[in-house]
Design a protein with these regions (language model features):
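N-terminal beta-strand motif that seeds the catalytic metal site of vicinal oxygen chelate
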Residues: 2-46, 105-108, 112, 161-165
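Vicinal oxygen chelate
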Residues: 6, 44-46, 103-148, 153-156
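A short, acidic/glycine-rich surface segment
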Residues: 22-24, 62, 71, 92-97
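Residues that flank catalytic or metal-binding motifs in active/ligand-binding sites
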Residues: 34, 73, 81, 104-106, ...
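Core segments of cupin and vicinal oxygen chelate
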Residues: 41-84
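Helix-adjacent hinge/juxtasegments
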Residues: 84-90, 94-111
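A short acidic/small-residue loop/turn micro-motif
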Residues: 92, 155-158
Length: 165
């Protein structure tokens, strides 16, 4: 990502305008039931399973053929509260390396308890997985294909002590 100079005061003014224009004191009920799954691309199914189930302790729930691309594997991990993290592989297609691009994934934040956060940090250390700690509550790491994952020791609906839901 390329950084461009910004007027921080103007950005905060714009955020305030957006809140005033679009946030309602009486927030309506969402039309959505939740996120069914988020799907990423895997270059190696077994390596991805070893990482997400073996290190991050997200149980593998299913391995099926991708209905849209014969020969492709679609597999799922339980990330709690009925949410799934899914992957596809695309054998024979050159999908290129992971890239953070406009419209693409910046990171996927997964809420864990403080106890799990400490435990998973120890497992990352033992496995030699590099990571960055932010604010004492976030661990940012990259999966085997380069996707950025955040393990966040804040409850669902909170972000760094602020209620966001």
């Amino acid at each position: 990502m390329t950084e461009t100079p910004t007027d921080l005061a103007a950005l905060e003014t714009e955020r305030a305008r957006l809140r005033e224009t679009y946030q309602s004191a009486q927030r309506p009920v969402s039309s959505a039931r939740g996120i069914h799954h988020t799907a990423l691309i895997s270059s190696d199914v077994e390596r991805t399973i070893r990482f997400y189930q073996g290190i991050l302790e997200f149980p593998l729930t299913e391995v099926i053929e991708n209905r849209d691309y014969k020969g492709s594997t679609h597999f799922f991990f339980d990330v709690g509260h009925g949410n799934l993290l899914a992957f596809f592989d695309f054998p024979g297609l050159d999908v290129g390396p992971y890239a953070e691009v406009l419209g693409g994934l910046h990171h996927l934040a997964i809420s864990v308890t403080k106890e799990s956060w400490d435990h998973l940090r120890s497992k990352l250390d033992a496995a030699g997985v590099p990571y960055q700690v932010e604010s004492g509550a976030s661990i940012y790491l990259r999966d085997p294909d380069g996707a950025r994952i955040e393990l966040l020791a804040d409850p669902l609906g909170e972000m760094y002590g602020s209620t966001v839901l």
